[in-house]
């Protein structure tokens, strides 16, 4: 799919939910009195579904906890909240699992018996993030 000369990873419209587009409100809140402009966290989370076909990683069954705040597709879409910003203004990254699924990260395989591994700090990494998969 290409929109405004931007290719969305070569996917076709049929790969997306909701007939090729994602939608979310411009305002969010708990009541008509307590509303604010939508924050980027919810938008980024929903676009994770639409562009990358990623599942929700928060608890959808009410019997577990999902991945919590450890990824954008979990509760991390609400991210850090300072006293001056609304929830979702500073979402967290995609989890390593999500990054692997979309091809943004190739994990370093760690076999049983490996004594140590070194990962570069995120700010020192190349365009591809570093992660490990332990077997």
Feature locations, PLM:
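Extracellular hydrolytic enzyme modules, especially secreted metalloproteases
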Residues: 1-135
């Amino acid at each position: 799919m290409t929109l405004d000369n931007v290719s969305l990873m070569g996917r076709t419209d049929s790969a997306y939910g909701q007939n090729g587009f994602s939608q979310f409100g411009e305002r969010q809140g708990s009541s008509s009195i307590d509303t604010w402009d939508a924050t980027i966290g919810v938008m980024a989370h929903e676009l994770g579904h639409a562009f990358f076909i990623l599942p929700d990683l928060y608890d959808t069954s009410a019997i577990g906890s999902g991945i919590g705040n450890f990824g954008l597709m979990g509760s991390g879409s609400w991210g850090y909240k300072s006293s001056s910003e609304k929830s979702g203004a500073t979402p967290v990254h995609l989890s390593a699992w999500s990054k692997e699924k979309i091809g943004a990260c190739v994990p370093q395989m760690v076999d049983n018996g490996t004594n140590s591994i070194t990962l570069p700090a995120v700010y020192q990494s190349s365009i591809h993030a570093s992660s490990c998969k332990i077997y």
